[in-house]
Protein backbone atom coordinates (compact mmCIF):
# COMPACT_ATOMS: atom_id res chain seq x y z
CA UNK A 1 0.00 0.00 0.00
CA UNK A 2 1.38 3.40 -1.02
CA UNK A 3 1.21 6.30 1.44
CA UNK A 4 -0.46 9.39 0.16
CA UNK A 5 1.72 12.52 0.30
CA UNK A 6 0.37 15.54 2.23
CA UNK A 7 -0.38 18.37 -0.15
CA UNK A 8 1.45 21.65 0.59
CA UNK A 9 -1.02 24.47 1.08
CA UNK A 10 0.19 28.05 0.89
CA UNK A 11 -1.29 31.51 0.96
CA UNK A 12 -4.09 30.81 3.50
CA UNK A 13 -5.68 33.91 5.19
CA UNK A 14 -4.36 33.02 8.73
CA UNK A 15 -0.76 32.78 7.60
CA UNK A 16 -1.02 36.09 5.81
CA UNK A 17 -2.33 37.73 9.02
CA UNK A 18 0.59 36.38 11.11
CA UNK A 19 3.08 37.65 8.56
CA UNK A 20 1.56 41.10 8.62
CA UNK A 21 1.71 41.27 12.49
CA UNK A 22 5.37 40.17 12.49
CA UNK A 23 6.27 42.85 9.98
CA UNK A 24 4.58 45.53 12.08
CA UNK A 25 6.44 44.34 15.25
CA UNK A 26 9.82 44.53 13.49
CA UNK A 27 9.03 48.04 12.29
CA UNK A 28 8.05 49.08 15.89
CA UNK A 29 11.28 47.73 17.40
CA UNK A 30 13.40 49.52 14.78
CA UNK A 31 11.67 52.80 15.57
CA UNK A 32 11.65 52.39 19.47
CA UNK A 33 14.83 50.45 20.25
CA UNK A 34 16.00 52.65 23.14
CA UNK A 35 12.60 52.74 24.85
CA UNK A 36 12.33 48.96 24.89
CA UNK A 37 15.81 48.59 26.38
CA UNK A 38 15.05 51.09 29.15
CA UNK A 39 11.77 49.31 30.05
CA UNK A 40 13.59 45.98 30.28
CA UNK A 41 16.24 47.38 32.60
CA UNK A 42 13.57 48.84 34.86
CA UNK A 43 11.81 45.46 35.09
CA UNK A 44 15.07 43.68 36.02
CA UNK A 45 15.81 46.28 38.71
CA UNK A 46 12.37 45.85 40.25
CA UNK A 47 12.79 42.06 40.44
CA UNK A 48 16.22 42.34 42.08
CA UNK A 49 14.90 44.87 44.59
CA UNK A 50 12.14 42.48 45.65
CA UNK A 51 14.68 39.68 46.21
CA UNK A 52 16.87 41.88 48.40
CA UNK A 53 14.01 43.16 50.55
CA UNK A 54 12.51 39.70 51.06
CA UNK A 55 15.87 38.13 51.89
CA UNK A 56 15.23 35.53 49.23
CA UNK A 57 18.65 35.39 47.67
CA UNK A 58 19.11 31.92 46.21
CA UNK A 59 21.02 29.39 48.36
CA UNK A 60 22.41 25.98 47.77
CA UNK A 61 20.65 22.93 49.16
CA UNK A 62 23.11 22.70 52.08
CA UNK A 63 22.68 26.28 53.23
CA UNK A 64 20.22 27.50 55.90
CA UNK A 65 17.09 29.17 54.59
CA UNK A 66 15.29 31.74 56.72
CA UNK A 67 11.71 32.79 56.16
CA UNK A 68 10.20 35.77 57.92
CA UNK A 69 7.34 38.21 57.49
CA UNK A 70 6.55 41.48 59.21
CA UNK A 71 3.43 39.96 60.78
CA UNK A 72 4.25 36.41 61.91
CA UNK A 73 1.45 34.08 62.96
CA UNK A 74 1.62 32.67 66.49
CA UNK A 75 0.52 29.26 67.75
CA UNK A 76 0.42 27.75 71.24
CA UNK A 77 2.02 24.38 71.79
CA UNK A 78 4.18 22.14 73.95
CA UNK A 79 7.76 20.93 73.90
CA UNK A 80 7.72 17.21 73.09
CA UNK A 81 10.50 14.60 73.02
CA UNK A 82 11.61 11.17 74.12
CA UNK A 83 14.23 12.84 76.34
CA UNK A 84 13.65 15.11 79.33
CA UNK A 85 15.34 18.11 77.69
CA UNK A 86 15.23 19.60 74.19
CA UNK A 87 17.85 21.92 72.60
CA UNK A 88 17.01 25.31 71.17
CA UNK A 89 19.13 27.35 68.73
CA UNK A 90 19.97 30.81 67.48
CA UNK A 91 19.34 31.92 63.88
CA UNK A 92 22.52 30.19 62.70
CA UNK A 93 21.32 26.97 64.36
CA UNK A 94 24.06 27.04 66.96
CA UNK A 95 22.71 25.56 70.19
CA UNK A 96 21.83 28.20 72.77
CA UNK A 97 20.52 26.01 75.57
CA UNK A 98 17.90 23.44 76.53
CA UNK A 99 14.31 23.49 77.77
CA UNK A 100 12.29 20.83 79.54
CA UNK A 101 9.76 18.81 77.62
CA UNK A 102 6.18 19.46 78.63
CA UNK A 103 6.75 23.22 78.73
CA UNK A 104 3.90 25.23 77.24
CA UNK A 105 5.27 27.64 74.62
CA UNK A 106 4.31 30.03 71.83
CA UNK A 107 5.92 29.73 68.41
CA UNK A 108 5.83 31.83 65.22
CA UNK A 109 4.76 29.79 62.20
CA UNK A 110 6.11 32.40 59.75
CA UNK A 111 9.46 32.93 61.44
CA UNK A 112 11.46 29.83 60.64
CA UNK A 113 14.86 28.47 59.75
CA UNK A 114 15.10 25.43 57.50
CA UNK A 115 18.05 23.09 57.23
CA UNK A 116 18.46 19.55 55.90
CA UNK A 117 14.73 19.24 55.38
CA UNK A 118 13.87 20.18 58.98
CA UNK A 119 12.03 23.37 59.92
CA UNK A 120 12.92 25.23 63.11
CA UNK A 121 10.36 27.65 64.54
CA UNK A 122 11.08 30.76 66.56
CA UNK A 123 9.73 29.72 69.96
CA UNK A 124 9.05 31.84 73.02
CA UNK A 125 9.50 30.27 76.46
CA UNK A 126 7.71 31.41 79.64
CA UNK A 127 10.90 32.30 81.54
CA UNK A 128 13.91 31.51 79.35
CA UNK A 129 13.56 33.97 76.49
CA UNK A 130 13.36 32.52 72.99
CA UNK A 131 15.11 30.40 70.38
CA UNK A 132 14.53 28.17 67.38
CA UNK A 133 13.06 24.73 68.13
CA UNK A 134 12.81 21.82 65.71
CA UNK A 135 9.39 20.99 64.34
CA UNK A 136 9.99 17.49 65.69
CA UNK A 137 9.92 18.88 69.23
CA UNK A 138 6.71 20.92 68.98
CA UNK A 139 3.16 19.68 69.30
CA UNK A 140 -0.26 21.17 69.89
CA UNK A 141 -1.54 17.99 71.52
CA UNK A 142 -0.63 17.74 75.20
CA UNK A 143 -0.91 13.94 75.02
CA UNK A 144 1.94 13.89 72.48
CA UNK A 145 4.44 15.60 74.81
CA UNK A 146 6.14 12.29 75.55
CA UNK A 147 7.29 10.37 72.50
CA UNK A 148 8.29 7.09 74.12
CA UNK A 149 6.02 4.10 73.55
CA UNK A 150 7.79 1.81 76.00
CA UNK A 151 9.72 2.35 79.22
CA UNK A 152 11.80 0.00 81.35
CA UNK A 153 11.74 -0.31 85.13
CA UNK A 154 14.90 1.04 86.74
CA UNK A 155 13.78 0.81 90.38
CA UNK A 156 11.35 -1.99 91.33
CA UNK A 157 7.95 -0.56 92.24
CA UNK A 158 4.36 -1.61 92.71
CA UNK A 159 2.06 -0.20 90.05
CA UNK A 160 -0.79 2.02 91.23
CA UNK A 161 -4.06 0.92 89.58
CA UNK A 162 -5.47 4.44 89.89
CA UNK A 163 -3.46 7.65 89.62
CA UNK A 164 -5.16 9.30 92.61
CA UNK A 165 -5.15 6.24 94.87
CA UNK A 166 -2.75 4.85 97.45
CA UNK A 167 -3.84 1.28 96.66
CA UNK A 168 -1.09 -0.86 95.14
CA UNK A 169 -1.00 -3.39 92.32
CA UNK A 170 1.67 -5.79 91.12
CA UNK A 171 5.40 -5.36 91.71
CA UNK A 172 7.38 -4.78 88.51
CA UNK A 173 11.03 -5.74 88.74
CA UNK A 174 14.09 -3.99 87.33
CA UNK A 175 14.37 -4.24 83.55
CA UNK A 176 10.67 -5.01 83.01
CA UNK A 177 9.29 -3.54 79.77
CA UNK A 178 6.12 -1.48 80.19
CA UNK A 179 3.88 -0.25 77.37
CA UNK A 180 3.16 3.48 77.68
CA UNK A 181 -0.52 4.38 77.29
CA UNK A 182 -0.50 7.98 78.52
CA UNK A 183 1.05 10.19 81.15
CA UNK A 184 0.08 12.63 83.90
CA UNK A 185 2.17 15.80 84.12
CA UNK A 186 5.88 16.55 83.93
CA UNK A 187 8.33 18.20 86.31
CA UNK A 188 11.52 19.52 84.73
CA UNK A 189 10.89 17.19 81.82
CA UNK A 190 10.52 14.07 83.95
CA UNK A 191 7.11 12.44 83.71
CA UNK A 192 5.23 12.58 87.01
CA UNK A 193 3.23 9.42 86.30
CA UNK A 194 3.23 7.11 83.32
CA UNK A 195 0.06 5.20 82.59
CA UNK A 196 1.35 1.80 81.52
CA UNK A 197 0.27 -1.70 80.65
CA UNK A 198 2.00 -4.85 81.84
CA UNK A 199 0.78 -8.41 81.31
CA UNK A 200 -2.80 -7.23 80.95
CA UNK A 201 -2.65 -5.00 84.02
CA UNK A 202 -3.00 -1.24 83.65
CA UNK A 203 -1.47 1.06 86.23
CA UNK A 204 0.68 4.07 87.00
CA UNK A 205 4.37 4.40 87.84
CA UNK A 206 6.46 7.46 88.59
CA UNK A 207 8.81 8.62 85.86
CA UNK A 208 11.70 8.71 88.32
CA UNK A 209 11.65 4.91 88.47
CA UNK A 210 11.88 4.11 84.76
CA UNK A 211 14.25 4.61 81.82
CA UNK A 212 13.67 4.71 78.07
CA UNK A 213 16.11 1.90 77.21
CA UNK A 214 16.88 -1.49 78.77
CA UNK A 215 20.53 -0.48 79.07
CA UNK A 216 19.71 2.63 81.08
CA UNK A 217 17.28 0.71 83.28
CA UNK A 218 19.89 -1.88 84.20
CA UNK A 219 22.81 0.51 84.48
CA UNK A 220 24.51 0.51 87.86
CA UNK A 221 24.49 4.00 89.34
CA UNK A 222 28.08 4.71 90.34
CA UNK A 223 28.53 8.44 89.99
CA UNK A 224 30.94 9.76 92.60
CA UNK A 225 31.69 6.15 93.53
CA UNK A 226 28.28 5.60 95.14
CA UNK A 227 27.96 1.99 94.04
CA UNK A 228 31.52 1.17 95.04
CA UNK A 229 30.83 2.42 98.57
CA UNK A 230 27.94 0.04 99.15
CA UNK A 231 28.94 -2.94 96.99
CA UNK A 232 31.16 -4.46 99.65
CA UNK A 233 28.57 -4.32 102.42
CA UNK A 234 26.95 -7.71 102.28
CA UNK A 235 24.19 -9.37 104.24
CA UNK A 236 26.00 -9.67 107.53
CA UNK A 237 23.10 -9.77 109.98
CA UNK A 238 20.08 -10.94 107.97
CA UNK A 239 18.72 -7.56 106.93
CA UNK A 240 19.97 -7.79 103.35
CA UNK A 241 22.91 -6.39 101.43
CA UNK A 242 23.58 -2.72 100.73
CA UNK A 243 24.36 -3.27 97.05
CA UNK A 244 20.78 -4.13 96.08
CA UNK A 245 19.30 -0.87 97.39
CA UNK A 246 18.55 2.26 95.39
CA UNK A 247 20.88 5.27 95.41
CA UNK A 248 19.68 7.22 92.40
CA UNK A 249 19.45 10.91 93.34
CA UNK A 250 16.03 12.19 94.30
CA UNK A 251 14.77 15.75 94.31
CA UNK A 252 13.85 16.61 97.88
CA UNK A 253 10.54 18.31 98.56
CA UNK A 254 10.42 22.04 99.19
CA UNK A 255 6.85 23.25 99.52
CA UNK A 256 6.50 27.04 99.29
CA UNK A 257 3.24 26.97 101.24
CA UNK A 258 4.65 24.62 103.88
CA UNK A 259 8.07 25.91 104.93
CA UNK A 260 10.08 23.67 107.22
CA UNK A 261 11.95 25.45 110.04
CA UNK A 262 15.70 25.42 109.53
CA UNK A 263 16.86 24.29 111.98
CA UNK A 264 13.85 22.61 113.54
CA UNK A 265 13.70 22.48 117.37
CA UNK A 266 10.84 20.30 118.60
CA UNK A 267 9.36 18.98 121.82
CA UNK A 268 7.35 15.76 121.96
CA UNK A 269 3.75 15.19 123.07
CA UNK A 270 1.89 11.92 123.44
CA UNK A 271 -1.76 11.64 122.44
CA UNK A 272 -2.87 11.02 126.02
CA UNK A 273 -5.86 13.25 126.86
CA UNK A 274 -4.15 14.40 130.06
CA UNK A 275 -1.20 15.69 128.01
CA UNK A 276 -3.23 17.24 125.22
CA UNK A 277 -5.49 18.82 127.81
CA UNK A 278 -2.52 20.97 128.87
CA UNK A 279 -1.74 22.11 125.35
CA UNK A 280 -1.88 25.80 126.24
CA UNK A 281 0.86 25.28 128.84
CA UNK A 282 3.12 23.59 126.29
CA UNK A 283 2.46 26.33 123.74
CA UNK A 284 3.20 29.04 126.32
CA UNK A 285 6.45 27.29 127.23
CA UNK A 286 7.54 26.90 123.61
CA UNK A 287 6.83 30.55 122.89
CA UNK A 288 9.10 31.57 125.75
CA UNK A 289 12.05 29.60 124.30
CA UNK A 290 13.49 28.95 120.84
CA UNK A 291 11.35 25.84 120.33
CA UNK A 292 9.61 26.14 116.94
CA UNK A 293 7.92 22.77 116.43
CA UNK A 294 5.93 20.00 118.10
CA UNK A 295 5.93 16.24 117.53
CA UNK A 296 2.50 14.79 118.37
CA UNK A 297 1.56 11.11 118.32
CA UNK A 298 -0.98 10.06 115.72
CA UNK A 299 -0.55 6.53 116.99
CA UNK A 300 2.09 4.91 119.18
CA UNK A 301 1.60 1.16 119.10
CA UNK A 302 -1.64 0.66 121.02
CA UNK A 303 -1.97 4.32 122.00
CA UNK A 304 -4.33 5.74 119.38
CA UNK A 305 -4.57 9.48 118.84
CA UNK A 306 -8.13 9.82 117.54
CA UNK A 307 -10.91 7.70 116.09
CA UNK A 308 -9.97 8.06 112.44
CA UNK A 309 -12.39 6.45 109.97
CA UNK A 310 -9.33 4.71 108.51
CA UNK A 311 -9.27 2.48 111.61
CA UNK A 312 -12.86 1.46 110.97
CA UNK A 313 -11.77 -0.01 107.64
CA UNK A 314 -8.38 -1.45 108.54
CA UNK A 315 -8.29 -1.96 112.31
CA UNK A 316 -11.60 -1.75 114.20
CA UNK A 317 -9.84 -2.56 117.47
CA UNK A 318 -7.70 0.56 117.16
CA UNK A 319 -10.82 2.60 116.45
CA UNK A 320 -12.43 1.23 119.59
CA UNK A 321 -9.50 2.26 121.80
CA UNK A 322 -8.92 5.77 120.43
CA UNK A 323 -7.89 8.28 123.11
CA UNK A 324 -9.69 11.26 121.59
CA UNK A 325 -12.47 12.10 119.20
CA UNK A 326 -11.63 13.62 115.84
CA UNK A 327 -12.89 16.99 117.07
CA UNK A 328 -10.89 16.91 120.32
CA UNK A 329 -7.65 15.98 118.62
CA UNK A 330 -8.25 18.40 115.76
CA UNK A 331 -8.75 21.29 118.18
CA UNK A 332 -5.36 20.60 119.80
CA UNK A 333 -3.45 20.49 116.52
CA UNK A 334 -5.19 23.64 115.34
CA UNK A 335 -4.20 25.51 118.50
CA UNK A 336 -0.56 24.55 117.92
CA UNK A 337 -0.72 25.69 114.29
CA UNK A 338 -2.53 28.91 115.17
CA UNK A 339 0.30 29.69 117.59
CA UNK A 340 2.72 29.56 114.65
CA UNK A 341 4.41 26.22 115.25
CA UNK A 342 5.39 23.52 112.76
CA UNK A 343 3.57 20.27 113.62
CA UNK A 344 4.95 16.78 113.01
CA UNK A 345 2.64 13.77 113.25
CA UNK A 346 4.41 10.68 114.62
CA UNK A 347 3.03 7.35 113.45
CA UNK A 348 4.36 3.93 114.45
CA UNK A 349 4.49 1.79 111.33
CA UNK A 350 5.33 -1.89 111.73
CA UNK A 351 4.69 -2.19 115.47
CA UNK A 352 0.93 -2.64 115.81
CA UNK A 353 -0.67 -5.27 118.04
CA UNK A 354 -4.20 -4.02 117.35
CA UNK A 355 -3.80 -4.51 113.60
CA UNK A 356 -2.38 -7.99 114.11
CA UNK A 357 -5.39 -8.83 116.26
CA UNK A 358 -7.70 -7.71 113.46
CA UNK A 359 -5.60 -9.17 110.62
CA UNK A 360 -3.47 -12.09 111.84
CA UNK A 361 -2.94 -13.09 108.20
CA UNK A 362 -0.59 -10.10 107.79
CA UNK A 363 1.28 -10.56 111.08
CA UNK A 364 4.78 -11.97 111.31
CA UNK A 365 4.06 -15.54 112.40
CA UNK A 366 5.81 -18.45 114.00
CA UNK A 367 6.26 -21.80 112.31
CA UNK A 368 2.72 -22.87 113.20
CA UNK A 369 1.20 -19.78 111.61
CA UNK A 370 0.29 -17.93 114.81
CA UNK A 371 1.23 -14.23 115.19
CA UNK A 372 4.65 -14.01 116.82
CA UNK A 373 5.00 -11.88 119.94
CA UNK A 374 8.50 -10.46 119.86
CA UNK A 375 10.16 -7.31 121.24
CA UNK A 376 7.08 -6.58 123.38
CA UNK A 377 4.62 -6.45 120.49
CA UNK A 378 2.97 -8.17 117.57
CA UNK A 379 4.31 -6.97 114.23
CA UNK A 380 2.58 -6.58 110.87
CA UNK A 381 5.03 -7.70 108.21
CA UNK A 382 6.76 -4.88 106.35
CA UNK A 383 6.70 -7.13 103.28
CA UNK A 384 2.88 -6.91 103.08
CA UNK A 385 1.53 -4.17 100.80
CA UNK A 386 -1.83 -4.13 102.55
CA UNK A 387 -0.02 -2.94 105.68
CA UNK A 388 1.68 -0.22 103.63
CA UNK A 389 -1.68 0.95 102.34
CA UNK A 390 -3.12 1.06 105.86
CA UNK A 391 -0.35 3.24 107.27
CA UNK A 392 -0.30 5.62 104.32
CA UNK A 393 -4.10 5.90 104.39
CA UNK A 394 -3.85 6.85 108.07
CA UNK A 395 -1.15 9.42 107.28
CA UNK A 396 -3.28 10.94 104.51
CA UNK A 397 -6.24 11.24 106.86
CA UNK A 398 -4.07 12.92 109.50
CA UNK A 399 -2.81 15.43 106.96
CA UNK A 400 -6.22 16.21 105.49
CA UNK A 401 -8.15 16.26 108.77
CA UNK A 402 -5.55 17.65 111.16
CA UNK A 403 -3.27 19.70 108.94
CA UNK A 404 0.09 18.22 109.90
CA UNK A 405 3.11 19.74 108.19
CA UNK A 406 5.09 16.50 108.27
CA UNK A 407 4.48 12.80 108.83
CA UNK A 408 7.13 10.92 110.79
CA UNK A 409 7.23 7.13 110.49
CA UNK A 410 8.64 5.49 113.61
CA UNK A 411 9.25 1.75 113.93
CA UNK A 412 9.81 1.74 110.18
CA UNK A 413 11.64 -1.54 110.48
CA UNK A 414 11.31 -5.22 111.19
CA UNK A 415 11.45 -6.35 114.82
CA UNK A 416 14.84 -6.87 116.38
CA UNK A 417 15.46 -10.12 118.19
CA UNK A 418 14.22 -12.55 115.53
CA UNK A 419 17.64 -14.03 114.72
CA UNK A 420 17.11 -17.35 116.50
CA UNK A 421 13.69 -17.84 114.90
CA UNK A 422 15.22 -17.22 111.47
CA UNK A 423 18.10 -19.64 112.04
CA UNK A 424 15.66 -22.35 113.06
CA UNK A 425 13.28 -21.58 110.20
CA UNK A 426 10.52 -21.00 112.73
CA UNK A 427 9.22 -17.68 111.40
CA UNK A 428 7.03 -16.56 108.51
CA UNK A 429 7.46 -12.99 107.24
CA UNK A 430 4.92 -13.41 104.38
CA UNK A 431 7.64 -12.36 101.94
CA UNK A 432 5.55 -12.47 98.76
CA UNK A 433 8.13 -10.89 96.46
CA UNK A 434 11.29 -12.49 97.91
CA UNK A 435 12.69 -9.12 99.00
CA UNK A 436 15.33 -8.40 101.59
CA UNK A 437 14.25 -6.57 104.73
CA UNK A 438 16.19 -3.48 103.70
CA UNK A 439 14.55 -3.47 100.26
CA UNK A 440 11.08 -3.62 101.82
CA UNK A 441 11.82 -0.72 104.18
CA UNK A 442 13.28 1.50 101.47
CA UNK A 443 10.47 0.69 99.03
CA UNK A 444 7.83 1.43 101.65
CA UNK A 445 9.40 4.83 102.23
CA UNK A 446 9.53 5.49 98.47
CA UNK A 447 5.83 4.71 98.26
CA UNK A 448 4.88 6.75 101.33
CA UNK A 449 7.01 9.71 100.28
CA UNK A 450 5.64 9.75 96.73
CA UNK A 451 2.03 9.67 97.95
CA UNK A 452 2.38 12.17 100.79
CA UNK A 453 4.28 14.65 98.65
CA UNK A 454 1.13 14.84 96.54
CA UNK A 455 -0.53 16.26 99.66
CA UNK A 456 2.17 18.88 100.18
CA UNK A 457 3.78 17.45 103.32
CA UNK A 458 7.23 16.19 104.23
CA UNK A 459 8.11 12.65 105.28
CA UNK A 460 10.48 11.69 108.06
CA UNK A 461 11.83 8.32 109.19
CA UNK A 462 13.10 7.38 112.64
CA UNK A 463 16.07 5.00 112.80
CA UNK A 464 17.94 3.30 115.60
CA UNK A 465 21.21 4.84 116.70
CA UNK A 466 22.91 1.67 115.49
CA UNK A 467 22.23 2.65 111.87
CA UNK A 468 25.15 5.07 111.92
CA UNK A 469 27.31 1.97 111.37
CA UNK A 470 28.51 0.97 107.91
CA UNK A 471 26.32 -2.13 107.56
CA UNK A 472 22.72 -3.13 106.99
CA UNK A 473 21.08 -3.85 110.33
CA UNK A 474 19.28 -7.10 111.12
CA UNK A 475 15.92 -5.29 111.15
CA UNK A 476 16.35 -3.78 107.68
CA UNK A 477 17.43 -0.20 108.40
CA UNK A 478 20.38 1.10 106.40
CA UNK A 479 21.07 4.80 106.87
CA UNK A 480 22.23 5.79 103.34
CA UNK A 481 19.29 4.05 101.65
CA UNK A 482 16.70 5.62 103.96
CA UNK A 483 18.34 9.05 103.87
CA UNK A 484 18.30 8.97 100.08
CA UNK A 485 14.50 8.62 100.06
CA UNK A 486 13.03 10.44 103.06
CA UNK A 487 12.95 14.21 103.53
CA UNK A 488 14.11 13.89 107.14
CA UNK A 489 16.07 11.13 108.85
CA UNK A 490 16.05 11.02 112.63
CA UNK A 491 18.52 8.88 114.50
CA UNK A 492 17.74 7.96 118.12
CA UNK A 493 21.18 7.90 119.77
CA UNK A 494 20.03 8.20 123.38
CA UNK A 495 23.19 7.94 125.49
CA UNK A 496 21.59 5.53 127.95
CA UNK A 497 20.90 3.12 125.07
CA UNK A 498 24.62 2.58 124.41
CA UNK A 499 26.41 -0.35 126.00
CA UNK A 500 28.68 0.11 128.97
CA UNK A 501 32.36 -0.39 128.17
CA UNK A 502 34.09 -1.59 131.31
CA UNK A 503 33.51 1.13 133.85
CA UNK A 504 32.75 3.71 131.16
CA UNK A 505 29.06 4.58 131.02
CA UNK A 506 28.20 6.51 127.84
CA UNK A 507 25.12 8.09 129.44
CA UNK A 508 27.37 9.84 131.95
CA UNK A 509 29.19 11.51 129.04
CA UNK A 510 26.48 12.88 126.74
CA UNK A 511 28.76 15.23 124.80
CA UNK A 512 31.45 12.66 124.02
CA UNK A 513 28.88 9.95 123.28
CA UNK A 514 26.99 12.18 120.88
CA UNK A 515 30.17 13.39 119.16
CA UNK A 516 31.21 9.81 118.40
CA UNK A 517 27.77 8.90 117.10
CA UNK A 518 27.30 12.07 115.05
CA UNK A 519 30.70 11.69 113.40
CA UNK A 520 29.67 8.25 112.17
CA UNK A 521 26.20 9.43 111.10
CA UNK A 522 27.74 12.29 109.13
CA UNK A 523 29.82 9.75 107.19
CA UNK A 524 26.66 7.83 106.30
CA UNK A 525 25.09 11.07 105.11
CA UNK A 526 28.00 11.58 102.71
CA UNK A 527 27.46 8.13 101.19
CA UNK A 528 24.21 8.97 99.45
CA UNK A 529 23.76 11.46 96.58
CA UNK A 530 20.62 13.15 97.93
CA UNK A 531 20.70 12.91 101.73
CA UNK A 532 17.75 13.82 103.91
CA UNK A 533 17.85 16.52 106.54
CA UNK A 534 19.36 15.01 109.68
CA UNK A 535 17.15 16.02 112.61
CA UNK A 536 18.11 13.93 115.64
CA UNK A 537 16.17 12.69 118.64
CA UNK A 538 18.01 13.66 121.84
CA UNK A 539 17.69 12.35 125.38
CA UNK A 540 15.68 14.84 127.45
CA UNK A 541 14.95 12.55 130.39
CA UNK A 542 16.96 11.18 133.29
CA UNK A 543 19.02 8.08 132.54
CA UNK A 544 17.20 4.78 132.96
CA UNK A 545 20.39 2.91 133.92
CA UNK A 546 22.54 3.14 137.07
CA UNK A 547 23.49 5.52 138.48
CA UNK A 548 20.32 7.08 136.97
CA UNK A 549 22.02 10.41 136.48
CA UNK A 550 19.89 13.45 135.86
CA UNK A 551 19.74 15.11 132.45
CA UNK A 552 19.43 18.83 132.98
CA UNK A 553 20.03 21.88 130.80
CA UNK A 554 23.80 21.31 130.62
CA UNK A 555 23.55 17.70 129.45
CA UNK A 556 20.93 18.54 126.82
CA UNK A 557 22.94 21.54 125.64
CA UNK A 558 25.99 19.28 125.31
CA UNK A 559 24.03 16.87 123.09
CA UNK A 560 22.85 19.70 120.86
CA UNK A 561 26.34 21.19 120.59
CA UNK A 562 27.88 17.83 119.67
CA UNK A 563 25.42 17.32 116.82
CA UNK A 564 26.03 20.77 115.39
CA UNK A 565 29.81 20.46 115.59
CA UNK A 566 29.71 17.27 113.51
CA UNK A 567 27.58 18.84 110.78
CA UNK A 568 24.16 17.44 111.72
CA UNK A 569 22.53 20.86 111.66
CA UNK A 570 18.90 20.01 110.90
CA UNK A 571 17.90 20.49 114.53
CA UNK A 572 16.62 18.11 117.18
CA UNK A 573 13.53 16.59 118.75
CA UNK A 574 13.63 16.23 122.52
CA UNK A 575 12.36 12.84 123.70
CA UNK A 576 10.65 12.75 127.07
CA UNK A 577 8.02 10.01 127.13
CA UNK A 578 6.18 11.52 130.10
CA UNK A 579 6.02 14.99 128.51
CA UNK A 580 6.88 16.40 131.93
CA UNK A 581 6.34 20.14 132.23
CA UNK A 582 8.61 20.10 135.28
CA UNK A 583 11.43 18.59 133.22
CA UNK A 584 10.85 21.17 130.49
CA UNK A 585 11.39 23.92 133.04
CA UNK A 586 14.67 22.30 134.09
CA UNK A 587 15.76 22.32 130.45
CA UNK A 588 14.66 25.90 129.76
CA UNK A 589 18.20 27.39 129.73
CA UNK A 590 19.24 24.97 126.98
CA UNK A 591 16.24 25.84 124.82
CA UNK A 592 16.49 29.58 125.44
CA UNK A 593 20.12 29.57 124.31
CA UNK A 594 19.39 28.05 120.90
CA UNK A 595 20.48 30.04 117.88
Protein language model regions, located:
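SH3/SH3-like (including bacterial SH3b) beta-barrel domains
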Residues: 89-101, 161-174
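Active-site-adjacent "subsite" loops/lids of carbohydrate-active enzymes
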Residues: 255-274, 331, 345-397
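Catalytic domains of carbohydrate-active enzymes, especially glycoside hydrolases
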Residues: 279-304, 401-406, 488, 563-571
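Aromatic-lined carbohydrate-binding/catalytic grooves of carbohydrate-active enzymes
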Residues: 289-324, 416-423, 584, 591
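Aromatic-lined carbohydrate-recognition surfaces of secreted/lumenal glycan-active proteins
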Residues: 342-352, 408-411, 437-474, 529-543, ...
Amino acid sequence: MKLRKRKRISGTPKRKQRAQRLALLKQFLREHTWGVMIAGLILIAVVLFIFVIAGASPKTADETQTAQTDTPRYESGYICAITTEVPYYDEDLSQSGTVARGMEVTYATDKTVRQDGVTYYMTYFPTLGHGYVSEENLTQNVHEVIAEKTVYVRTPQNLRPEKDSYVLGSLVEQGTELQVLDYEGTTNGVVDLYKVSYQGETGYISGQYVATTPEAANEVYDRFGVYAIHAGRGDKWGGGDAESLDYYPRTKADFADNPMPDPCYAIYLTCDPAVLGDIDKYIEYAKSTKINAFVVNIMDGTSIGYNSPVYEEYSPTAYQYANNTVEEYQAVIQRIKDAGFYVIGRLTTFNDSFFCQDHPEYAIADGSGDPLYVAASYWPSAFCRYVWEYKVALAIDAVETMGFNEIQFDYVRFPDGTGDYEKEGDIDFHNEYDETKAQAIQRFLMYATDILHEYGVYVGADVFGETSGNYVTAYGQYWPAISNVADVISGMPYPDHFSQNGTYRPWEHPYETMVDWAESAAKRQSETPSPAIARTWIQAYDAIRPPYNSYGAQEVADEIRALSEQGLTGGFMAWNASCSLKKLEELRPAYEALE
